[in-house]
Amino acid sequence: MNTMNSVLKYKELALYGGSFDPLHKAHLAIIEQTLELLPSAKLIVLPAYQNPFKKPCFLDAQTRFKELERALKGIDRVLLSDFEIKQERAVPTIESVLHFQKLYHPQTLYLVIGADCLRHLSSWTNAKELLKRVELVVFERIGYEEIQFKGHYHPLKGIDAPISSSAIRASLGV
């Protein structure tokens, strides 16, 4: 994992946000495959303080951040950011995109999302503006293979980890 200053040399950035509640092997597979798909990009992993589309998190923000910090240690081209956690509220994706564009001025900014997010992307805050500012990298999710999206995106296929944080929480009875 790298420092914020190491981001400046990259012309391409990718943002991968999420609750990571809890972190699991599919998250790590997405990170690995994003780095392979975008060999010239720096990947910023952005845990949410609170996902605006989900119930309050099971694990607190600092615990989730520390889990990510341990898991990402030593992975080149990955930066873990606490930008959204420091806001102590649900942060719309467009706000994070604007923050990182202003901070680093990348030529290309990718947004890594799951296929399930395409279904309700139009309901996100300033969705049209968001889609003008980013290129989407979309990873497959079981049950969302046939989603229709009228726009360009880079597919991230073959995430061979049919696990979701929701399923893990459900198995724990929370």
Curated annotation (Swiss-Prot):
EC numbers for this chain: 2.7.7.18
MF (Gene Ontology): ATP binding; nicotinate-nucleotide adenylyltransferase activity
Keywords: ATP-binding, NAD, Nucleotide-binding, Nucleotidyltransferase, Pyridine nucleotide biosynthesis, Transferase
Pathway the protein acts in: Cofactor biosynthesis; NAD(+) biosynthesis; deamido-NAD(+) from nicotinate D-ribonucleotide: step 1/1
Cell division as UniProt keyword: no
Transcription keyword on record: no
GO biological process: NAD biosynthetic process
SUPFAM superfamilies: Nucleotidylyl transferase
Reaction(s) this enzyme catalyzes, per UniProt: nicotinate beta-D-ribonucleotide + ATP + H(+) = deamido-NAD(+) + diphosphate
CDD domains with a match to the protein in the record: NMNAT
InterPro entries listed in its UniProt record: Cyt_trans-like, NadD/NMNAT, Rossmann-like_a/b/a_fold
Family label: Belongs to the NadD family.
Entry function: Catalyzes the reversible adenylation of nicotinate mononucleotide (NaMN) to nicotinic acid adenine dinucleotide (NaAD).
Protein's name in the database: Probable nicotinate-nucleotide adenylyltransferase
Gene (UniProt): nadD
